[in-house]
Amino acid sequence: MIRRIQPIQGIAVIEFTLASSVLFVLLFSIISIGYLMFSLQAINDVTRKAARLAAVCQISQSQQIASSVAASSVIAGIDADSIEIEYLDQDGAVLASPTAQNVRFVRARVVSLTYQLLSLLDFLGESGLIDIPSFETTIPSESLGIVPNGTNTNC
């Protein structure tokens, strides 16, 4: 008796399902890591904007600067409390009561931020929650809101 071997049907669908599921997981992981890199660059941009504004605006407006920079950020987790603006002397020490005469540098930093990864990457960090390192920008002070004729500017 001769048995006929029948071709297995449906194996291509199973192979496609297995291969496509692995490729989709890989694709979404790459997208998630890409968005993390974009977020880190946007946080760096926030520190740069805050430092620039603090260098040209009045010292008393540092909280308003932090609020406006946080509001214009493309990252949702940044608020005014996570942006610190500090005024430094010529040695780089933080001034307790800065004035336009003793400020030589301005430092802006973003602190206490976390990033939630895509649920596929929950094995990273604590359930996908990653602590973002502190970003800071230090630049020389400029006008600090004082114009040559002695009047103050309003940033």
Across the structure, where does each feature detected by a protein language model lie?
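Alpha-helical assembly-interface signal, strongest on the long, hydrophobic N-terminal helix that forms
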Residues: 1-71
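Short, conserved structural patches
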Residues: 49, 53-155
